[in-house]
Amino acid sequence: MYMARMLSEMSTVKRPDGCYIVDQEHYQIVSGYAGELLPSNSNVCNCGISVALQKLENKSHNGMDCIIYTSSFPDCSHCLEKILNLKISKIWHWNSPTTTKELKILEMLEASSIQCEKYTPTRTISINFNN
């Protein structure tokens, strides 16, 4: 999730987000951030998920059973369609779905056997310089 958050910092668009896709062994396959690629079609979103999925399609990897780490929940039909077609197995997202549209997308993903979980940090590092 750290990489997805750092990728979102590279974003130059109004709604920054980053996406990091790994295989089942957690090896990086592709990454992307919003605004990285210019869309060839104005009807296609240019979010980090879309950019990473576009890169995944251009590789020889089929995307099956991959895991997506994203700084924002996928909220567009274009990304949803790509996620379903590539048979992604799990999505870790930083922000929880809050809108009605996002909740419907969450239901569709879970109905398609795609696990969706909000990422919660499990470890914190604190350094005390006063000793």
Curated annotation (Swiss-Prot):
Domain CMP/dCMP-type deaminase: from-to ranges: 1-116
Any single Pfam family the record assigns to this protein: dCMP_cyt_deam_1
Molecular functions (GO terms): catalytic activity
Top-level taxon of the source organism: Eukaryota
Name of the protein described by the UniProt record: Uncharacterized protein F10E9.7
Species in which this protein is naturally found: Caenorhabditis elegans
Native organism taxonomy: Eukaryota, Metazoa, Ecdysozoa, Nematoda, Chromadorea
